[in-house]
């Protein structure tokens, strides 16, 4: 029987030494076990832990001890009570959170993984407490606001530029005269204004007419609230459903039933072959789109012929361009500069 008792004592010593080795100063409750600090077992639920914390917090709260008193109601000094209150609060913060409690229990059971315990402890303490979803939402809103105002800035720049182009300016002036808008600026008598005021009002009238009459396409088009990132994310399920419906209709109508393409479908195929976005394609003039349709570029073979012709034409233009001639001459005679590490 004696060897069996010796074995049990040895195992108990190893268990206690391992448990003590897991308690490191600076981690959680230091050299004390957080469960023992609160007087609860490792099987205690959140309710038991919260009740134990409230009792001990009332017992050791520093406000119960006056600065001049040597001993408080429970025979504690103000300093010792404050230390115990902090320890109780630390134990509660450790055990009330499920993830932190799992890490702490793992530390008690695996004291040999010293560096892992340090990593998990400080990674949780130093991790930001802000909800990631809030951070993402704020970031999306900030990007959306920046998008919207930058698009308005680009749109106003385009309007200001078009107001200086003679072609559009003359058209806007004619429309303003027909509507009698310019006559109002030339008032007489007491209501007469300076030339600067009249000119400023005329410019504003011209800009307003250009805004209303000219449909700007592409990157300088008038901003739409539903184009910003926030609404694109919100409406993504709708756009996805719309695309799937369109794709299924395309397959059924043209691949299965074999119907001919309409003008909209032909332009879509042409744009797809040209690898242009919708906004880029919209900036093309109508006569160019009509030319594409006349050349039947929605047919892949016709488009390949058109693309090769365009490449040949571009090469001819570059060959006859004086700037490209000078560049080729320079490349042939001198070439680009080179870095060398050779000693002079």
UniProtKB/Swiss-Prot annotation:
Protein name, UniProt field: DnaJ homolog subfamily C member 25
Domain named J is located at: 33-108
Biological processes, Gene Ontology terms? protein folding
Q: Which domain of life is it from?
A: Eukaryota
Q: Which Gene3D superfamilies match?
A: DnaJ domain
Its membrane topology is listed as: Multi-pass membrane protein
**Where does the record say this protein resides?**
Membrane
Question: Which Pfam families does the entry link to?
Answer: DnaJ
Q: Which PANTHER family match?
A: DNAJ HOMOLOG SUBFAMILY C MEMBER 25
Origin species, per record, is Xenopus laevis
- Which keywords appear in this protein's UniProt record, sorted alphabetically? Chaperone, Membrane, Transmembrane, Transmembrane helix
* InterPro entries named in the record: DnaJ_domain, DnaJ_domain_CS, DNAJC25-like, J_dom_sf
């Amino acid at each position: 029987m004696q060897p069996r008792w010796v074995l049990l004592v040895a195992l108990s010593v190893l268990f206690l030494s391992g448990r003590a080795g897991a308690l490191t100063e600076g981690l959680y409750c230091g050299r004390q076990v957080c469960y023992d600090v609160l007087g609860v077992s490792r099987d205690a639920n959140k309710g038991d832990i919260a009740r134990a914390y409230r009792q001990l917090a009332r017992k050791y709260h520093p406000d119960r001890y006056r600065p001049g008193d040597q001993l408080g109601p429970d025979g504690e000094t103000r300093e010792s009570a404050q230390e115990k209150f902090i320890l109780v609060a630390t134990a509660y913060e450790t055990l009330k959170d499920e993830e932190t409690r799992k890490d702490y229990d793992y530390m008690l059971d695996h004291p040999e993984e010293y560096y892992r315990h340090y990593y998990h402890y400080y990674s949780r303490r130093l991790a930001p407490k802000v909800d990631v979803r809030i951070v993402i939402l704020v970031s999306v809103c900030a990007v959306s606001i920046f998008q919207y105002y930058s698009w308005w800035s680009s749109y106003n720049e385009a309007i200001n530029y078009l107001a200086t182009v003679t072609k559009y300016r003359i058209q806007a002036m004619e429309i303003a005269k027909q509507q009698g808008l310019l006559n109002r600026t030339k008032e007489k008598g007491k209501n007469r204004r300076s030339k600067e005021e009249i000119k400023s009002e005329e410019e504003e009238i011209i800009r307003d007419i250009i805004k209303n009459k000219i449909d700007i396409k592409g990157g300088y088009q008038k901003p739409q609230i539903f184009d910003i990132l926030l609404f694109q994310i919100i409406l993504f399920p709708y756009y996805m459903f719309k695309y799937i419906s369109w794709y299924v209709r395309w397959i059924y109508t043209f691949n299965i039933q074999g119907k001919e393409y309409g003008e909209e479908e032909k332009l879509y195929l042409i744009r797809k072959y040209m690898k242009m976005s919708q906004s880029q394609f919209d900036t093309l003039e109508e006569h160019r789109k009509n030319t594409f349709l006349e050349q039947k570029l929605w047919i892949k073979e016709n488009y390949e012929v058109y693309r090769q012709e365009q490449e040949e034409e571009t090469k001819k233009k570059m060959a006859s361009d004086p700037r490209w001639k000078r560049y080729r001459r320079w490349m042939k005679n001198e070439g680009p500069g080179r870095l060398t590490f050779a000693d002079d």
